[in-house]
Swiss-Prot record:
It comes from Clostridium botulinum (strain Alaska E43 / Type E3). It is an enzyme of class 3 (hydrolase). The active site is at D65. This is Ribonuclease Z. Keywords: Endonuclease, Hydrolase, Metal-binding, Nuclease, tRNA processing, Zinc.
């Protein structure tokens, strides 16, 4: 089970009643934060999910409404008892930005690793204590994909595929004469050398089960590579900077999207559900324009600050 919270829904500048666009993903207690504008940690405090267990921070691009909250958040994480490494990923140039913002935090009690991405994947192992980079596709349980999109600064969209461990099969283990004392290690997908024989996980595990895919797209035009990137997403979170179709010229000029354009992406990508977010500060009632999205992709909703969504694995 995966919990997700839309921490803030506005773009450009924080408002009195709306935080800047950011999202927090909770996978069995380990957390991923997407973007960190001014006020993001206040929004996090309101939902009460804590700071210590944020292992991965994904920054879409360098604009201040997506980054200015970083130094304060990193400091709060340290004050909350964080000692394990924290990984920050983002587009090329993010290292310089993080280093600059973090000048006021010279003594963080944990290591900070910054990774610059260019249309590539990262694999992670998530355990009960942290999230680790991993090279082994069989051992990892999270795949993070990135795609460079079209904005006024280098900007990335992200896709998160949370893998699901195959079921353990007693019948298969018995049929393959696997000693019971090896079952636990093989279930954890370890390869075991026992009694001069190699035992592999496929001897005790059924076929892989479908995982959960979450795609996050903001600050971009609807470029041609996006439908394939978000393909079959269980949840597609997408910017809807402009609700009205009449604002299409603004969307093109400022390299953003209208609700209808976001919904068209969701339809082309055959997504299960669309959540619209990152609204223009001038868009005071985005729900009034929801039908512009629903006409194209029915399973569309307008996010509000603090919206929590639970995603369950399907057998």
């Amino acid at each position: 089970m995966i919990d997700l919270c839309i921490l803030g829904t506005t773009g450009g500048m924080p408002m009195v009643n709306k935080y800047l666009s950011a999202t927090l993903i909770n996978i069995n207690g380990r957390k991923i934060l997407i973007d960190c504008g001014e006020g993001t940690q206040v929004a996090m405090r309101e939902i009460g999910w804590g700071f210590k267990s944020i292992d991965l921070i994904c920054i879409t691009h360098s604009h201040g409404d997506h980054t200015i909250g970083l130094p304060g958040l990193l400091s709060t994480m340290g004050n909350s008892g964080r000692t394990e490494k924290v990984i920050i990923v983002g587009p090329k140039g993010i290292k310089e930005i993080v280093n600059g913002l973090n000048i006021i935090n010279p003594y963080l009690p944990y290591e900070l690793e910054v990774v610059e991405l260019e249309n590539n994947d990262l694999k992670f192992i998530i355990d009960k204590n942290n999230m680790f980079l991993c090279e082994d596709n069989d051992k990892c349980n999270l795949i993070l994909s990135s795609l460079e999109v079209e904005h006024s600064a280098k900007c990335l969209s992200y896709s998160f595929y949370i893998k699901r461990r195959p079921r353990f099969s007693v019948e298969k283990a018995s049929k393959n004469n696997v000693p019971k004392l090896l079952w636990s290690k093989l279930q954890n997908q370890e390869i075991v050398n026992y009694d001069n024989k190699i035992y592999t996980p496929d001897l005790v595990l059924d076929n892989a089960r479908k995982g959960i895919k979450i795609s996050y797209v903001t600050d971009t035009r609807p470029i041609s590579t996006l439908p394939q990137f978000i393909k079959y997403s269980d949840l597609f979170i997408c910017e809807g900077t402009y609700g009205s179709d009449e604002d299409i010229d603004k969307a093109i000029k400022n390299k953003h999207m209208t609700f209808r354009e976001s919904a068209t992406l969701a339809k082309k990508g055959e997504c299960n559900e669309l959540i619209l977010t990152h609204f223009s500060a001038a868009l005071s009632a985005p729900e009034n324009f929801l039908n512009n999205a629903k006409e194209i992709f029915h399973n569309s909703i307008v996010a509000h600050d603090g919206l929590i969504k639970t995603l369950k694995f399907i057998d």
